[in-house]
């Protein structure tokens, strides 16, 4: 129950600390005795760097924010202002293909493994010309 002063204004507790300290306390669940949010409510972000052949810059993508490969490819098309990025399930269809480096350091085509396995093993991604990516395909 909130306590009120003589003028009817709700009294609040003032805490001092460095900037962001209250947010950190809230994330840890210590503020006001509230329990931390359940793990089912928290979705971890998993950022990886993405490069594209012919561009002088990198982008960072949270792969855990997407539900499947098609959403990821659409986002990459938007990021690099390109509409020629696609999955390598059909040859000659796309000018660019997306490959990723897994935990073992191997480069693999995006779409070759189940989505959950990709999210957990992707270390970085590269958008390369489709003709160069043909040798990486598991069904080539």
UniProtKB/Swiss-Prot annotation:
Annotated region described as Disordered, given as residue ranges: 1-40
Function description: Aux/IAA proteins are short-lived transcriptional factors that function as repressors of early auxin response genes at low auxin concentrations.
Residue ranges of the motif EAR-like (transcriptional repression): 14-18
Induction trigger: Not induced by auxin.
InterPro entries on file: AUX/IAA_dom, AUX_IAA, PB1-like
This protein's record includes keyword Nuclease: no
Keywords of this entry: Auxin signaling pathway, Nucleus, Repressor, Transcription, Transcription regulation
Tissue: Expressed in roots, seedlings and flowers.
Family stated for the protein in its record: Belongs to the Aux/IAA family.
Subcellular location: Nucleus
This protein's record includes keyword Thylakoid: no
The protein's assembly and partners: Homodimers and heterodimers.
Ranges of Basic residues composition bias in the record: 24-33
Full protein name: Auxin-responsive protein IAA26
Biological source species: Oryza sativa subsp. japonica (Rice)
Spans through the membrane: none
Pfam families in the cross-refs: AUX_IAA
GO cellular component, one term: nucleus
Domain PB1: 45-130
GO biological process, one term: regulation of DNA-templated transcription
Origin superkingdom: Eukaryota
